[in-house]
């Protein structure tokens, strides 16, 4: 398996549940405060066809005091990947396939996509794009939180993450990873 240095760096920094909580508090303020009991989950998964694959990072957590079980998938992309929604759906299906063997429900999955590539992000964060409102209630949806580092100023990153210096430097490093290449 070919692992890029920035993949290892990203996983090392963001494998800490406290940092995942901070990410949610910053980038998903509307639900961040309701999430607790974040725990890392094994990222090795098998599809129904017994194909093995690895997720970037995966955590279980609870929302408020309910028994609801949410898993959080973090993906980071250094380039625009038009197939990302398909990949997220595939990962979600594999997680549900495994979970339903032990639980009697399909837990919600929060997908977080880190983007620090060179181009503008132009993939909708809610898919499919449905123009007919009657059709909308019959259509499966995929939503994900996009953290587009190109759209966040260094000052905002510093002010939001100053309480965790490792996270601050990790995000700034990911944001500026291509700067020296361009210069």
What positions do the PLM features span?
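Elongated, amphipathic alpha-helical interaction scaffolds
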Residues: 1-183
